Amino acid sequence: FKIIAQWHQYHGVKKAIERALDALTKRKDGKGGVLWFTQGSGKSLLALFYVMNLREHPEFKNPTVVVVTDRNDLDGQLYDTFALSSWSLRGSPVQAEERAELKEILASTEAGGIVFTTINKFAPEQGKNVVDTLCERSNVIVIADEAHRTQYGFNASMDSKTGVTKYGLAKYMRDALPNAIYLGMTGTPISSDDRDTESVFGTYVDIYDMVDAQEDGAVVPVSYESRII
């Protein structure tokens, strides 16, 4: 079977590849930008097309891709999408079920590979506030889906019960993969003092919002009428 990108997916992937190349060769800041694509516009296939295109650019030297979500059902959904299209990816994706398995995969992989995991697996062991560096290569690409939810917590805070200083999971993930390029995908980015999606991942790579999606017929409009009963 064939999978063909819609126009917004095609242009979004093209811009995301350009941003990743810029982060790899020029800025070297690990910020792959934010793809703001509304719910229902095909972000799972967008991620698939992005990985397929990464493989076509020799600058990335057969990158390792880590797809990170914040819950098991979304992790399984994305994994299934990629597994059904493994013929196009030069390898079969793997799903890290346990923290030890994730560490083993990332520490032992020298190039290539697509790993699916949830962000909680990057957390330090109980009672600690540091994590081991798992891979220092710069050709590691992290795709953070629903990036507005868990990609914060870079400043230290103290647990009032234990007195242990801790950080958010996003910092621990970056400590484990310090030279990776991080692409954020979300349908609802956040911009506030302590949570700002753009400040974490870089500026928007491309935007396909609800208005665009409705005009294309990709999603249907939702009407709401308030009533007092």
Language-model regions, residue ranges each:
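RecA-like P-loop NTPase motor core of helicase/translocase proteins
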Residues: F1-I229
